């Protein structure tokens, strides 16, 4: 029986790319939301002991899932779960071996944060097995693994800044049906940043304080309307220009009734917010043969916190409609 955490996907409801930093990263400002599409990450074995060297051997196996083949073909050192485990043990002064198993359902390289969410789950599991860090230190550790990992440790609705390490959780919910279109296109994130051409002195045109207030109003009222006019993704125009199929999928969601549709992250997935599952079914039919449509919903901060508690189980995660 393994300790298991559900690792939720995310979408960027809003993503501004700000100035390029001296460390080569970019500052961003984003409204993120967790969705029920998820992987499951299990810590099957952990043989750890104090050590000055802090070296650890990591094994990762696939438990299947719609994207399980990715785990099978990826060396542990290239998987963010493996990187998270190695960093955790080095910082905690632990050596030995750990073994993870992942049921992979979140498309890879699609702007849905699957790898980061898996890494966040691995950090939680390791810290529960070998308590070493408080929440703040675990967030700092996560930022060294990947820019989205601090958010994935928090989940739900949140505003993120810096390069992603500054996370402000938001209360409330948006009771929409969410349709995700997996376009099956790999978009190079580094290339997308280069195409934006942000300089070190670039400043955002958005009034951030007003935006934050409108986000809170939207989540409190349960509708995207208060903030919809300010939402954007700075990558969307350049990526859609390079890959017309992504723009076509987004536009198809709008035509099928989405109250808001956009690209998430640097692509290639797009999402739509719908009033009913029937509208998502219509989008699935319209895109049949060209892209996969996943029906899901938002995950609140409370739901994410509850899932972060480990459960001893070998059960498969419930499926999300495709």
Where are these regions (language model features)?
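DPxDG-like acidic metal-binding loop motif
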Residues: 81, 110-136, 151, 155
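Conserved, helical-rich catalytic subdomain that frames metal- and/or nucleotide-binding sites
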Residues: 154, 159-260, 275-288, 294-322
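ATP-binding N-lobe of GHMP and related small-molecule kinases
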Residues: 1-110, 128-133, 173, 182-185
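Phosphate-handling active-site elements
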Residues: 89-101, 125-145, 276-289
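Residue-level signal for inorganic ion chemistry
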Residues: 13, 41-43, 81, 115, ...
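N-terminal pre-core extensions flanking Radical SAM catalytic domains
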Residues: 263-277
């Amino acid at each position: 029986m393994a300790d298991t955490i559900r690792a939720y996907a995310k979408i960027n409801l809003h993503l501004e790319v700000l100035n390029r930093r001296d460390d080569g990263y970019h500052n961003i400002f984003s409204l993120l939301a967790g969705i029920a599409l998820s992987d499951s990450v299990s810590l099957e074995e952990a043989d750890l002991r104090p050590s000055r060297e802090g070296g650890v051997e990591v094994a990762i196996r696939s438990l299947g899932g719609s994207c399980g083949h990715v785990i099978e073909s990826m060396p542990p050192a290239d998987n963010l779960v493996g990187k998270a485990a190695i960093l955790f043990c080095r910082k905690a002064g632990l050596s030995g071996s750990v073994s993870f198993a992942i049921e992979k359902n979140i498309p890879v390289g699609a702007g849905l944060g699957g790898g980061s969410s898996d890494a966040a789950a691995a950090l939680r599991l390791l810290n529960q097995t070998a308590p070493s860090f408080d929440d703040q230190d675990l967030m700092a550790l996560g930022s060294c693994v990947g820019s989205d990992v601090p958010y994935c440790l928090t989940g739900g609705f949140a505003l993120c800044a810096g390069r992603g390490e500054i996370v402000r959780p938001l209360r409330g919910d948006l009771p929409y049906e969410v349709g995700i279109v997996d376009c099956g296109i790999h978009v190079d994130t580094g290339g997308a940043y280069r195409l934006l051409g942000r300089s070190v002195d670039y400043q955002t045109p958005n009034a951030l304080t007003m935006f934050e207030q409108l986000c809170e109003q939207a989540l409190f009222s349960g509708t995207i309307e208060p903030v919809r006019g300010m939402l954007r993704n700075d990558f969307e125009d350049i990526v859609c220009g390079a890959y017309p199929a992504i723009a076509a999928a987004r536009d198809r969601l709008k035509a099928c009734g989405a109250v808001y549709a956009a690209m998430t992250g640097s692509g290639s997935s797009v999402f739509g917010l719908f009033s009913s599952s029937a509208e998502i079914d219509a989008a699935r039919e319209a895109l049949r043969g060209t892209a996969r449509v996943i029906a899901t919903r938002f995950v609140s901060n409370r739901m994410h916190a509850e899932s972060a508690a480990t459960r001893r189980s070998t059960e498969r995660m419930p499926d999300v409609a495709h």
